Amino acid sequence: MKKIILSSFLIASFGLLADDHLPPGYSKYQSNFLFTCSMPAKCLKAFNDYMNAPEIVSQNFEADMYAVMHNGWDEATHGISFYYKSADEYAKGNQIYVTSEAGRKFRKRIDELDIQGTSQNLTVHTVGVTNSGSAAENVVSLRWSLDVSNPAKFLPLWKGFSKSIEKYDWSANAYGLQSHYLGN
């Protein structure tokens, strides 16, 4: 009986430790925009002005602007990522960007700075590998992005690729991401 109780406790503790939950607050709903900006300080100011506008601040959105050193498939120099708590907040964030006065001013400033959007595919699949730890906590990653015109044909290829990398120690940190760009 003692062995059964200890075994049950051990199995339960492994389950609790290995449940692979994302950290609290990690968002799986994201809008990511890549672009080319030759004047980073002015691009950052335009982004900050947008994020500090009253109609945006009141939403308490979480966002990052970052430099892109080399992504291997276009000339993007910077990116902006918005992180949402739910699909509803994701939809609302995109609606506010399109319909608000702050969004209009931000888009106008983007045009004035001649910022060139590089995210022009409707569907992009990203394969990412993190350096160590969970993808949500890691600041270093390697990503390949593919323009996929037929997801039904792509899925068997993805499954084969996923199976082929299982032999590598970093495979537990690899992930696939389907992105839908709502515009550039």
Predicted segments, located by residue:
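Short S/T/G/P-rich N-terminal loop/turn motif that feeds into the first structured element of a domain
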Residues: 18-184
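Sec-dependent N-terminal signal peptides
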Residues: 3-13
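Non-cleavable N-terminal signal-anchor transmembrane helices
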Residues: 1-4, 98
